[in-house]
Design a protein with these regions (language model features):
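Secondary-structure capping and boundary motifs in well-ordered enzyme cores
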Residues: 12, 60, 67-77, 94, ...
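Generic detector of well-ordered alpha-helical segments enriched in charged/polar residues
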Residues: 21, 42-45, 65, 86, ...
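Short, well-ordered loop/turn and helix-capping segments at boundaries between secondary-structure elements
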Residues: 3-5, 25-26, 46, 50, ...
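Glycine-rich beta->alpha junctions and the first turn(s) of the following alpha-helix
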Residues: 1-78, 152, 168
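C-terminal helix-coil-helix/basic helical segment that borders enzyme active sites and/or dimer interfaces
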Residues: 59-62, 76-134
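Glycine-rich phosphate/cofactor-binding loops in nucleotide/flavin-utilizing enzymes
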Residues: 14-26, 30-34, 121-173
């Protein structure tokens, strides 16, 4: 039990966890970051089409392009789920367990994109701190993003917790 002066009480007494869960649902809905992922994939596709130092463009690597396309398909599906969820929120409904799905898939897509960037940057991604003298462009940021966004699967409730929420509330397990 926590004692709070009546002047500092927010909402009804004893409803703190209920309010916290609603706030977490909204945070998870926003964790999908589809707009950022879409921009990063578009930029990566443009970079893959360019030849670097006379080497064939990465766009000619079928395995890389297959992986890129798979992430694009996942992202497109996530965008539709996000739009449906946002439409429900706009009509006055609270985000439900789909917010867990948005967070789960959104962060996994972000990490898949970071992995593609690391693969595309090759050895230019090795420096953790950006050094303008290394690489053709922004490759050195790949490692920074890759390591920094490992946290995405932890904040707003770890992805393992999101899987449990989905199993309980969506699948009825």
């Amino acid at each position: 039990t926590v004692e709070v002066p009546i002047d500092n009480l927010v909402g009804e007494e004893g409803k703190g966890w209920t309010y916290g869960k609603v706030l977490l649902q909204h945070e998870r809905t926003n964790s999908a970051n589809t707009f950022r992922s879409e921009y990063r994939l578009r930029t990566l596709r443009e970079q893959a089409a360019q030849s670097v130092r006379g080497a064939p463009p990465l766009a000619e690597d079928r395995n890389f392009m297959r992986r890129l396309a798979a992430v694009e398909v996942d992202l497109k599906a996530l965008e539709y789920i996000e739009l449906r969820t946002l439409a429900a929120v706009a009509s006055g409904k609270a985000p439900g367990p789909e917010s867990s799905f948005l967070k789960l898939m959104g962060t996994e897509i972000q990490q898949a994109i970071d992995t593609l960037y690391m693969d595309a940057a090759g050895y230019y991604a090795l420096p953790y701190r950006p050094d303008p003298g290394v690489g053709e462009g922004g490759e050195t940021m790949s490692a920074l993003r890759y390591f920094n966004f490992r946290k995405a699967t932890i904040y707003a409730g770890s992805n393992e917790i999101q899987k449990n929420i989905i199993a309980k509330h969506v699948l009825g397990l």
